[in-house]
Amino acid sequence: EGGWPTSSSVFAKASGPSNPAEYTSKEFTGECGVSKPWYVRNDYNSPDEEITLVEATAQSINTAFVGLALQLGGDACKIRDTEWRMGLHQASGKKIPPYPAAIILGATSVSPMTVASAYQTLANEGVYCPPVPVLSIVKDGKALALPALGSACERRVDAEVARGVTRLLQGPLRSGGTASGSGLAGGRPAAGKTGTADGSNETWFVGYTPELSTAVWVGTPNDLRNERVVRNICLRPAGETKGCSAGRYGSVFGATIAAPIWKAIMDRTLEGTPKTPFADPGSAITDGEKVDIPDISRRSLDDAKALLLQAGFVPSVV
């Protein structure tokens, strides 16, 4: 869970739909790297730039998240371990494959229930609770005893870290975010993220409030092969057989269909319930821990290095 404050910036390589950024094996460490060049595209052309985590999350800049992983040391396996603790795994139940594309950008097979459960860990301030498909069983008019629903819940992520991630994930639903049109009714606090696979054959929106986490997947089955690409979509209300009165879309993204469906589900489910705010993260998460830098002026090289080491720094001589 080590990382950068939410106010930090990361370096994002220039990238776009037709000019992907290239990453090589030398940029990653550990066993979850790449064996050949990995090409990463953003949905729109962007230059080499330093971009804040707030902007990168709100605008869904793929190369910024790769840049963040590299700034964290380039060991994607550590990121995968955190995902596993949060309840994120493949549809088979196994860990996410050991490749940066799967770990950092989500290019793998997972179920909506799994992703909603992982986001629930954030909504619950770092405490993971496994999904419970059966809430009660009634036999002959009597409810049978079931294990306490909260008995399997356990802390998987530091509460302050979870609050910091939630702070970032509120960006996509705000003005300028990828899903700014899907904010919840009445300004109810919510956090979430859009997701779009190559070719738009799968699009997602996963989001949550302090009470509820919901994942929406819009896609087509694997066995349709080339027909999986979701384009030129015509939407119409139930009962209508002609026309596209609910919208026509040439290209589909996570914000196009999945996010509005998510909003409709959340608004209806939470209607009439109190609007609960998210807890704010502390300054150590938003701004980083402040430490005093020792005065090493007029010190010998050895003395200066010793003072910096004593203060917790790792000195480097250039």
Feature map (PLM): residue ranges:
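Extended, hydrophobic alpha-helical segments in both membrane/secreted and soluble proteins
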Residues: 1, 6, 10-11, 19, ...
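Structured segments of extracytoplasmic/periplasmic soluble domains
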Residues: 2-3, 13, 59, 63, ...
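Second-shell loop/turn segments in exported
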Residues: 39-44, 52-54, 63-71, 100-108, ...
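Stable alpha-helical elements in mature extracytoplasmic
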Residues: 49-53, 61-68, 75-84, 101, ...
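Short, glycine/proline-biased beta-turn/loop segments that scaffold the active-site neighborhood
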Residues: 1-50, 129-144
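Ligand-recognition elements built from short beta-strands and adjacent flexible loops
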Residues: 272-318
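Mid-domain, small-residue-enriched loop/turn segments at the edges of structured enzyme/sensor domains
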Residues: 31-39, 73-117
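A penicillin-recognizing enzyme superfamily signal
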Residues: 4-7, 33, 55-58, 109-286
